[in-house]
UniProtKB/Swiss-Prot annotation:
InterPro entries: Adhesion_dom_fimbrial (IPR000259), Adhesion_dom_fimbrial_sf (IPR036937), Adhesion_dom_sf (IPR008966), Bact_Fimbrial_Adh_Pro (IPR050263). Transmembrane segments: none annotated. Keywords: Cell membrane, Fimbrium, Lipoprotein, Membrane, Palmitate, Signal. A lipid is attached at C20 (N-palmitoyl cysteine). Belongs to the fimbrial protein family. Residues 1-19 form the signal peptide. May be a minor structural protein required for pilus biogenesis. The keyword Membrane applies. The keyword Lipoprotein applies. This is Minor fimbrial subunit HifD. One of its GO terms (biological process) is cell adhesion involved in single-species biofilm formation. It comes from Haemophilus influenzae. A lipid is attached at C20 (S-diacylglycerol cysteine).
Amino acid sequence: MQKTPKKLTALFHQKSTATCSGANYSGANYSGSKCFRFHRLALLACVALLDCIVALPAYAYDGRVTFQGEILSDGTCKIETDSQNRTVTLPTVGKANLSHAGQTAAPVPFSITLKECNADDAMKANLLFKGGDNTTGQSYLSNKAGNGKATNVGIQIVKADGIGTPIKVDGTEANSEKAPDTGKAQNGTVIQPRFGYFGSLLRHR
């Protein structure tokens, strides 16, 4: 008898933070006098394809993870086209691959890239991660699929730093992500700030 496949859905809000002319955004306090504006950013991560609504064999997880939010940056900064709207596809994963707490499976790389930033603006770029109603210090996106959802399974985002440092998605300023080293300024601009990550399934308990 074939079992009903479990569902996996999580919501992730992403926003960078900065201060503009005394105005405070998202509780952050960064130095600088230039005004900032929002750029919309949306990513979609699917476990298997078929429009993200799939009927998988027994012992497999299915569903989708929606990444959405905004990047707040100075007027000189722009978001690379391929970072604005994207689908990050996670492969089908068998239950045996997530059999115990702390186990991860199916890591998929993705990045968020800015362009045309001057040196000062690039150094101020920060990303603040928040996933739905995640609690303080939580380092995975909770499953919001509803009835029939996979239990104890979420989505983890880690840095592409060679170590796989988990990103905390509680939306606190202390856990915001600073732009990596952007290189030397060239003709008023810098090498594109690029935030690199991996998204994967996580058995959290």
